């Protein structure tokens, strides 16, 4: 108290400037985050609508149509929940109670788990599509959507069970006076776990992430090997001077490969940051930046998937030409 009473005007001015700078930075991050969420919601809504129309019109579904359509729905719901949670981070405290905190945060984590499991399944299915007829994976090319849905549901249930400790550890904290709490929003925090419980949870979390990431890494490696082998065979048949024309499946595979590789980096980053926040950090600004980075995949993915759909690209081009012609007239 004495330090505050007898502090110099310069130090008080410096403290005020630092506080204003932090608030300004927080405001910029918030505006950027909500812009990201808006773009992601628009993209996923459009992609979901496209897949619904394809289903209604009776188009023959491809092996990857179900997981891509499901991903758009998952990401749409996840971004909506994230936007609602973010209002308690960037705008104002809503005074949520324990039930609301547990419901929102756990629902958000469940949707993120669905995203991880569905992306893992998508990488496996894309590897199956690319596999040659002589491959042992070729027999799975005619797998039914029911089996795909069952596999995604099984992985998601395992993911939910391991993360169910959040239902106990998430609480409403109207007044953050203890440093032991881990910041989630202005109204919600995570209770610190004992060393034993933290060790058990971290081990289960590591096993879960390692299993799903391993599936994606193996399928990605398999697809890269197949693409490389096909390129060498084509160059051998047609000569090195001619650039071989890519099939639609190969172009789609390369695009999905880049997207899944990016998702892998984001997942590894999220795991590292989550563990470090649990053990060392509790900074709302760092947490806000982490939130922005974590949602890049959900925001970018629908546009990447749409770029592989020739009929969507043609539709958007024709729509753009109509808008330009309308403005000219």
Curated annotation (Swiss-Prot):
Disruption phenotype: Mice lacking all but one V1ra and V1rb gene (12% of the V1r repertoire) show a lack of chemosensory response to a subset of known pheromonal ligands and changes in maternal aggression as well as male reproductive behavior. Belongs to the G-protein coupled receptor 1 family. GO terms for molecular function: pheromone receptor activity. The chain crosses the membrane at residues 33-53, 66-86, 110-130, 151-171, 210-230, 255-275, 286-306. Residues 54-65, 131-150, 231-254, 307-329 are cytoplasmic. Residues 1-32, 87-109, 172-209, 276-285 are extracellular. It holds the Pfam family V1R. Disulfide bonds join 101-188. It is a multi-pass membrane protein. GO terms for cellular component: plasma membrane. It is found in: Cell membrane. It comes from Mus musculus. Its main location: membrane. Keywords: Cell membrane, Disulfide bond, G-protein coupled receptor, Glycoprotein, Membrane, Pheromone response, Receptor, Transducer, Transmembrane, Transmembrane helix. Glycans are attached at residue 175. This is Vomeronasal type-1 receptor 42.
């Amino acid at each position: 108290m004495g330090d505050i009473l007898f502090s110099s005007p310069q130090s008080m001015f410096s403290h005020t400037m630092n506080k204003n700078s932090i608030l300004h930075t927080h405001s910029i991050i918030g505006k950027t985050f909500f812009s990201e969420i808006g773009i992601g919601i628009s993209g996923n809504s459009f992609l979901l609508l496209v897949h619904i129309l394809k289903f209604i019109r009776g188009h023959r579904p491809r092996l990857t149509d179900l997981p891509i359509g499901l991903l758009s729905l998952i990401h749409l719901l996840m971004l909506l929940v994230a936007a609602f949670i973010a209002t308690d981070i960037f705008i104002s405290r809503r005074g949520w109670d324990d039930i609301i905190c547990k419901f929102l945060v756990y629902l958000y984590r469940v949707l993120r788990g669905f995203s991880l499991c569905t992306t893992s399944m998508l990488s496996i299915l894309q590897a199956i599509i690319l596999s040659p007829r002589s491959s042992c994976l070729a027999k799975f090319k005619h797998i039914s959507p029911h089996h795909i849905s069952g596999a995604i549901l099984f992985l998601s249930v395992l993911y939910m069970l391991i993360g169910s400790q959040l239902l106990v550890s998430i609480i409403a904290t109207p007044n953050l006076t203890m440093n032991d709490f881990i910041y989630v929003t202005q109204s919600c925090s995570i209770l610190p776990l004992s060393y034993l419980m933290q060790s058990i949870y971290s081990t289960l979390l590591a096993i879960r992430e390692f299993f799903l990431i391993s599936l994606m890494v193996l399928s990605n490696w398999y697809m890269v090997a197949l693409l490389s082998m096909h390129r060498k065979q084509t160059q051998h048949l047609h000569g090195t001077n001619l650039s071989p024309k890519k099939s639609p499946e190969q172009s789609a595979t390369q695009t999905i490969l880049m997207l899944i590789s990016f998702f892998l980096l984001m997942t590894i980053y999220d795991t590292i940051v989550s563990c470090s926040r649990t053990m060392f950090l509790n900074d709302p600004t760092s947490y806000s930046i982490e939130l922005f980075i974590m949602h890049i995949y959900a925001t970018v993915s629908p546009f990447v998937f749409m770029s592989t759909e020739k009929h969507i690209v043609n539709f958007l081009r024709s729509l753009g030409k109509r808008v330009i012609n309308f403005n000219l007239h």
